[in-house]
Amino acid sequence: MKLPYSWLKELIPDLPPVADLEPTFAHLGLPLEGVEDVPAPVGGVLLVAVKAAEPMEGTQLTKLTLDTGENGEKTIASGAPNAVGLPAGTMVALVTPGTTLGGITYGVRPMQGVESWGMAASAKELGIGESNAGILTFPAGTAAPGTPLRELWPADSVLDVEVTPNRADVLSALGLARDLAAYLNLELKEPQIPAAPTQPGEIRVSLPDRGRVLDRDPQGKLRFGCDHFAARAVSGLQNGPAPLWMQRRVSLAGMRSIDLIVDTSNYVMLELGQPTALYDRRDVAGDGLVVAFGLREGETVKDLLGNTHQVGPEDLLILDAGMSDEPVMTVAEAFASAGQPKEGSHVLGIAGIMGGDHGHVRADTRDVVIESAHFDPVLLRRTSTRLGLKTDAVYRYERGVDPLLAPKAAVRVAELLRAAGGTPEAGQTVVGTPEVPQTITTTGEQIRALLGMHIGTAEMRESLTRLGCTVTGDGDSLTVTPPSWRVDMVIWQDLAEEVARLHGFTELPETLPTLRVHESNIGASAQSEARAELRRTLAGLGFQEVVTYTFTSDEEAQKARAEAPGVRLRNPMTTDRTGMRTALYPSLLRAAGAHPKGERALLFEIGRIFPAAGEQERLGLLMRGDLAARTYQDGVRGDFSVFKGLVQGFAGAVGASFALEQLRGDDVPAALHPGVAGAVVWNGERVGWLGALHPEIAQEFGLKGDTFLMEAALPLPGRDWAFRDPSRAPAAWRDLAVIAPQGVSYGDIVGVLKGAGGELLESVEPFDVFTGEQVGAGNRSVAVRLTYRGAKTLTDEEVDPVFNAQIDAVKARGWAIREK
């Protein structure tokens, strides 16, 4: 946020110089992003009065006859669009002959038959603003003709303050001055604003019911549509340039000066932090304003810039009351009561965001209706984000505007317009019941314990009072009611932060915190530690962790043959991030594709997916390329057996059992090669799948060579551990060769042998695979070593029954035992 130092100095007369303020802002938690020194206009720029503005026939120029004071009457030719029809008396900034500006020295020169004496300049040309849409103009009587502009527009310093999202109260000159005055313990001189009239005005206002349930708000985060609204009419205005002092402040704050009415609205927002809107009263039918939840789905509203927006039942709009004398809930109801008027003709604006094409002020506006309101910040944020409308007003609303400020801001606008020649009506309509700050109860000891600072309770009371809080309580107790503008002060920890801020964060002692473990956090800590263990183990095996977006698109899901996104984003950041992913492996494929070609990739990710069944946490692994660098000899090529071995090593490292069950037919995930796919069995439970990436998908993602994937649900099932003394007895072995069809997986064979092996069977290890005429066409022989161990040395009489039971189990499956 940008503000001129002179504005803050007016509010805090004893404010230190700019050079001394940088540490102060840092201590307040509002660091300065920069300080820009803005020089005064050069000495040869004078304020002069327009006597006549005449179009020059056959040209795009306007002849201006000027009263320059001591230099008498002069003429210039101007091509500025706003020079046409300038009223007599209007003052402009004239660059006089002999003055150098922007490297150009101006003089007297003939232009289309007119002797042009210098140039009427824009704010940008003078270096005092960003607008170059036309010449800089001021109201008649701003100064005596011939007055140097620098006398009324002195040099200044513009402070660029970094404001955190929770500190909406400092998004104004008054709010920032309050904080500075409280910290520096200096006197604050607030703007003199009369009390709001107690009698209602001529403008009627209708608000929507509170507590309305919206389809897209099942958790009730939206508290209200509009809970406070002030409206007042001002008549007899002569719209034109704003006063010089107002233009100066608006320009230095980074906004473009438009005209008296618009600048006044912007000025009050910059001064008090309350956005306002002003409508041409000619367009406010029925002298009433209706705040209503949006049009029927799919209807459109045109904003004051001419852009069309599609709005729906959950967007808050401002309408005139010409359609009905009764309060309405929705615009659709209002349309129905009016017999379907022309689309958009009665919509005055999108509440709190931007005015509409109908009702905005124009050059010939004489009478206005002031709107000053408090809207639901969540509702406005959603609407502005969806419509892509980010304005200075919604920037403040979505962070939290003072809910009680609306009537005061309306009075301020009315009084500034009165000073410019307007006549505010005697009354002011105020409707709604805004939320008031809730009382917070704490103790000095509680705050001291949190901060670790020895601050007396009396000092805490004094600090909070300086911030505008109402503080009561005896002894060590503190009962605090925050000011209405501090919507961020809700719990006692917020009070502790404010005490520390005013006392000085630099005074915080360097002490180790006292950590308290609550029983409700034990489960969460265990889950976090389990994830950390997974990460450490996988990193030890050579995998690198990647963290990718949970967003994806239909196109990417289709490329990866994954389920299309079911959860859609209303306002996607980009076209390739339109929904929530339903699988983890497409993200890993994208990350692998970003690796330099030819390099190996051992990647893992622990992340969330959002399929139709609901949100899940997953572990994904990917391997491609060589496992060892290729130099003068071949490297270690990453194949399926290597990848499976890495997963087995991972399981062993975390004390889990791992098995792979072959998948066939429709059970094979679409991402995998039909012949190299298996189900991951972890501690006896199926948790996911593992296999080779389908070649067509690899081609889609630009991955050459073999790529292997695993995806499993988290948390991985644990084992029920029971301690057993290691046996001191030796093991007994038997070798067995099983002849089975080649379609039978090794995992199936092991499962049969383990199922019949009982407690004596310790392990099953393969040592030979054979195919040939001896075992029959379409078959293969898998030879395994069976290891048995008991509490004592096993005899043949104890081992043979178990071994024979395993042989019987094999034969029962229709398989054979190879004798030779």
Swiss-Prot record:
Main location: cytoplasm
Keywords associated with the record: Aminoacyl-tRNA synthetase, ATP-binding, Cytoplasm, Ligase, Magnesium, Metal-binding, Nucleotide-binding, Protein biosynthesis, RNA-binding, tRNA-binding
Binding site for Mg(2+): D488, D494, E497, E498
Catalytic activity: tRNA(Phe) + L-phenylalanine + ATP = L-phenylalanyl-tRNA(Phe) + AMP + diphosphate + H(+)
Family matches, as SUPFAM superfamilies: Anticodon-binding domain of PheRS, Class II aaRS and biotin synthetases, Nucleic acid-binding proteins, PheT/TilS domain, Putative DNA-binding domain
Cofactor: how bound: Binds 2 magnesium ions per tetramer.
Pfam families: B3_4, B5, FDX-ACB, tRNA_synthFbeta
Domain FDX-ACB, chain residue ranges per copy: 727-818
GO process annotations (BP): phenylalanyl-tRNA aminoacylation
Family of this protein: Belongs to the phenylalanyl-tRNA synthetase beta subunit family. Type 1 subfamily.
Protein name: Phenylalanine--tRNA ligase beta subunit
Native organism: Deinococcus radiodurans (strain ATCC 13939 / DSM 20539 / JCM 16871 / CCUG 27074 / LMG 4051 / NBRC 15346 / NCIMB 9279 / VKM B-1422 / R1)
Organism lineage: Bacteria, Thermotogati, Deinococcota, Deinococci, Deinococcales
Gene: pheT
